[in-house]
Amino acid sequence: MNMETIAKMSCNPAMGGVAKGQIVREIDALGGYSAIVTDHTMIQFRMLNLSKGPAMWSPRAQSDRMRFAEKWRMMLEANPNISFWQEMVVGLVVKNGVVKGVRTSLGLEIPAKTVILTNGTFLNGIIHIGERKISAGRAGERASTGITAQLVELGFEAGRMKTGTPARVDGRTLNWDVMEVQHGDEPVGKFSFTDTPKLKKQRPCHITYTNKKVHEILKTGFDKSPMFTGRIQGIGPRYCPSIEDKIERFADKDRHQLFVEPEGWETCEVYVNGFSSSLPEEIQYKAMRLIPGFENAKMFRPGYAIEYDFFQPTQLKVSLETRLIKNLFFAGQINGTTGYEEAGAQGLMAGINAHLKINDQEPFVLKRSEAYIGVLIDDLVNKGTEEPYRMFTSRAEHRILLRQDNADTRLTPLADKLGIDVKDRLARVHKKDAAYEKIAKFIHNTSIEPSDIDQILTERGSAPLRQKMKMHKILLRPNMSINDFRKSIPKVDAFMSQFEEEFIGCAEINLKYEGYIRKERDQVEKINRLENVRLYEIDYATIKGLSLEAVEKLNQLQPATIGQASRISGISPADVSILLVYVGR
């Protein structure tokens, strides 16, 4: 609709986070650009959850909002296979149940073999600030109209969702000295498995808190809040509530944490993470000035809530193609998700599968045991969603296999088989695999003398050695790392110095957790037996013994495999057994 806002970050100027960082690395492993752009434009990097096990470690970058969009535009324009056209699409060209192109607001018909809808929050979007309603897709941009009405007419089930964004403030008016400082990691990490530059300097974020006075001021606007008066019909994100929602739901809390995040290198604009609101702007402003550090704050623009249309993702195949209209794909918030990362993953998968569809090839489907992207799409297609869906590590039952450090070894070989240009990434995967073999062999074969390691063991609260022991056995102890051996044993340091730090880190995780990883892989093998049993178009009403709910859900969703069927809400183990008997015939 507007080429000047391509890749504009609508909300938080950040990429990654818990489970989201894993998705960004998976996109990169599959040949996507998200991680590359993030590495080139971030102002701070942090690895979250380092106090927990490696399955929970999640990279997060604070981004330069303006540079992020600029870098994306440059990369897209550098691709000769991408064409651009600035206009609003108001309808689809559909003939005999097959999409043939799109129709624009100027009346142009653009033919296409496949169409992917990635409408974000723009479908009949309405911004709410207090008692005011504004038709918009986001601040300063018009809403998209026409598509929802046509899709509903074609038989699609539509719904409304809501999200919000906080006020932006002038960083020059803040008292940074009274806030907690949050520095980035040293050494600095990155997202992409390609040769992107590492950040040489970082900008800090800050932390402050609301208080009782802030809450009292905010409450004075509740009678004008569209959320409490019923003007907002859409359901908001459970895990990213507005400040008024937090005060209402957690009335026993005297304060709520706020992250004060710079929007870039060369701007004074600041994003107040945790202060999302749709209250009248004067209430937002008055309350904000009671936050420590914000006593003299000037607001650039108030926070707002936005309502928009979405379509139940149970209307999609696992390829993200719609069941009702052939060659039509949905990706992003139109499917009920929230977040840049979830949307980017769906866009990549929809794009891959649209290409495969045109070329009469089987769709590319990632299993739950292969990627967070697989978990995301499987959840959406099989369970649907009644609220904006956000990815968490807890949603992935095989998360010890789906770590951020091994996204490349999991997915890059699959991307290569599809014909995606991942030559450099694949060469690095081979190098990483070879490094692991050498490191594992060295650690299993090297014996350590007590005198070389006992001091560090004592410092770590671990029992000293009685006799020399294989390095591998010592490494299995809690709080012991390869770096501990490098510090005290020159031959270990000399050997490890030939490898990249990331390769060493990945090898260490694989060695320390190899027992858990082996058990998880055995479990996956059992589950995959069901994933490999295909289900073709079946009238489930003809299968005796299935529950009425199972017949209804299976006929509606038409799962591709027994495994997919088993994850549909309402399908019992007894129903799965009946399906196995039926398919066996």
Please name every model-derived segment.
Residues 1-91, 106, 118-135, 142, ...:
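Conserved N-terminal/central alpha/beta ligand/cofactor-binding core
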Residues 395, 401, 412-577, 581-585:
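Extended, charge-enriched "interface" segments that sit outside catalytic cores
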Residues 2-3, 20, 149-285, 293, ...:
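An anion/pyrophosphate-binding glycine-rich loop and adjacent beta-alpha core
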Residues 333-341, 397-399:
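Glycine-rich phosphate/pyrophosphate-binding beta-alpha loops
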Residues 265, 271-337, 365-378, 500-553, ...:
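A glycine-rich dinucleotide-binding beta-alpha-beta segment and adjacent secondary-structure elements
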Residues 105-114:
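Core beta-strand elements of the Rossmann-like FAD/NAD(P) dinucleotide-binding domain
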Residues 114, 119-123, 279-280, 292:
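Glycine-/small-residue-rich beta->alpha transition segments that form the dinucleotide
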Residues 27, 343-364:
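Internal hydrophobic alpha-helix adjacent to the cofactor/substrate pocket in enzyme cavities
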